[in-house]
Amino acid sequence: MLTLFLLTVLIYHRCFRRYDADPEPELGLPAKRLTFLSGPNRLQGYLCGTGDTLAVLAPGLGNGAFSYAPQIQWLAEAGLRVFSFDYTGCYGSTGRSCRGFPQAADDLRAALRFLEENGRFGSRRLVLLGHSMGGYAVCCALPGSRVDAAVCIGGGNSPME
């Protein structure tokens, strides 16, 4: 039993380690760097584009704010304002490790609070986009939020599954 526990701990720490890019991918369009808190950690985010709709992109495990640069660029060119961010323990954010799926949900909720506190940077509508771990975070963030639409790609049907 102890062996299984230790093996589980080892696998967990390997999967949910700190993720860094070398070098960080380029976005290809102007982006404003923003920081906000999620618990004790300072997270780094980027806001680009203009428009009445704000799309918040929650990346998958091991990815950062610019890992979806082609999609961000396409959304911005289509007239959306896009906010993407690095999770705890990933890329430009602080933290020793990404800490797993529950932390991603906490980080997305912190990002949404930050955006609401800043008037969504002038946007009236809010759309959440999540892939993999980010899709899970989107499902977790929906209850009680003021989201107009959500796209969850490979993230689970609910936070309980």
Predicted regions and their residues:
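The serine-hydrolase catalytic nucleophile loop
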Residues: L61-W74, Y87
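Short beta-strand element of the alpha/beta-hydrolase
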Residues: D52-G60
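Alpha/beta-hydrolase active-site loop
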Residues: C98-G119
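Glycine-rich nucleophile elbow surrounding the catalytic serine of serine-hydrolase chemistry
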Residues: G130-C140
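Alpha/beta-hydrolase fold nucleophile elbow
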Residues: R120-S132
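Hydrolase active-site cap/lid region
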Residues: C139-E161
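Glycine-rich "HGGG/HGxG" loop immediately N-terminal to the catalytic nucleophile
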Residues: D86-F101
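An N-terminal hydrophobic leader/cap segment in hydrolases
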Residues: M1-L37, L43-Y46
